[in-house]
Amino acid sequence: KRTITFSPVLRERLGHHIHGEVWANNIKKVLKDNQLLHRPIHIISANMHSVMNSIFAPKLLQKQLNATDEFDIFEALSTSGNDKLRTKVEKEALKKGMIYIEDESGTNINVQIFDTSKIDFSKTSYTCTAKNDEEKPVLFVMDYAFGEQAYETIDEFLKPYSSKDKTKKEYLNVASVSIMGKAGILEGGKGD
């Protein structure tokens, strides 16, 4: 048996996630700029439309689609040719607490951030029990990432946010991480 060692430079490069670091820092800056950095953050790896549709689509489209079941609404949204419905839901979400961050780091992982203090839960199927805005959670939805890429991006995101001059570190209040996808565990087709 032999011990294999790596040079300090190689160890640093292997542990330094260039794209993931840029991705995470961009997102943490947006959280900071919107006073969301210290709120409870729930990280969800999912299709970009899933959380947005589940929060905003049922009440927004119920009458228009004459639907009695939320799943009928979700099915209508996933039908090709319903771009106008999808756009309507996205516009509503952007007006009511969703921030969309298109990736510019090279990870190709876009992000949606939902500030639940701006969501009127009486118009959703959900409730929020937090008493004041500082306690209301932030839903952080990252487009599906798997394997090494998921590890790299989450690893970098969970690190404290550093100021530009690197003198102050701010820790995130991560309440949960949900990275379970449907791939291989549920029936259905792509986009379900």
Task: Enumerate the language-model features and the residues they cover.
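Accessory terminal and edge-of-domain segments that mediate assembly/interaction
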Residues: 1-192
